[in-house]
Swiss-Prot record:
It is a multi-pass membrane protein. Belongs to the chemokine-like factor family. Its main location: membrane. Residues 49-176 form the MARVEL domain. Acts as a backup for CMTM6 to regulate plasma membrane expression of PD-L1/CD274, an immune inhibitory ligand critical for immune tolerance to self and antitumor immunity. May protect PD-L1/CD274 from being polyubiquitinated and targeted for degradation. This is CKLF-like MARVEL transmembrane domain-containing protein 4.
């Protein structure tokens, strides 16, 4: 009987020792979800943005600007060439800048740079693209030689202008909402800080 009691005591000590060593061991099995580790280590696509109006318009703008640029690049001869060169610059610039913003917004990369006002950045991009695409399309329509590539470039230029104009309107609304929300947050923060300052003298008088 005594041997059995000693054996039970030895097993209890061994189990408690193993539990302590297991708790203090640095090599613990991770229970972190796989999706969370992927989100921390890699990029994560935002399907809600791509399904929204601004995301769809961004995709349409990139496609239209690219097609307009391809159409203008197929023209081999021009006289005068100023309108063609201007349209080429506008379509290429709009494609690159809008494409970069689309990648940043769809992958939530802009959240890693909170110092930049991205709503205002998007508004400026869409507004300038609307203006310059409209001017470039009018100039190319007035100075083209009625070739198929030039006519196609003009058509896609005006389509891109329309897409950027709608996006400018939506971006303006989003920017106004963000400005109002920021001002409201600043007001609430200022009220909270003022209440804290007013309550400190009373606390000091009670302490004395």
């Amino acid at each position: 009987m005594r041997g059995g009691e000693e054996l039970d005591g030895f097993e209890g000590e061994a189990s408690s020792t193993s539990m302590i060593s297991g708790a203090s061991s640095p090599y613990q099995p991770t229970t972190e979800p796989v999706s969370q580790r992927r989100g921390l280590a890699g990029l994560r696509c935002d399907p809600d943005y791509l399904r929204g109006a601004l995301g769809r318009l961004k995709v349409a703008q990139v496609i239209l600007a690219l097609i307009a640029f391809i159409c203008i690049e197929t023209i081999m001869e021009c006289s005068p060439c100023e309108g063609l060169y201007f349209f080429e610059f506008v379509s290429c610039s709009a494609f690159v800048v809008t494409g970069v913003l689309l990648i940043l917004f769809s992958l939530n990369l802009h959240m890693r740079i909170p110092q930049i006002n991205w709503n205002l950045t998007d508004l400026v991009n869409t507004g300038l693209s609307t203006f310059f695409f409209f001017i470039a399309s009018i100039v190319l329509a007035a100075l083209n030689h009625k070739t198929g590539a030039e006519i196609a470039a003009v058509i896609f230029g005006f389509l891109a202008t329309a897409a950027y104009a709608v996006s400018t309107f939506l971006a303006m609304q989003k920017w106004r909402v963000s400005v109002r929300q920021q001002s409201t947050n600043d007001y609430i923060r200022a009220r909270t800080e003022s209440r804290d300052v007013d309550s400190r003298p009373e606390i000091q008088r009670l302490d004395t």
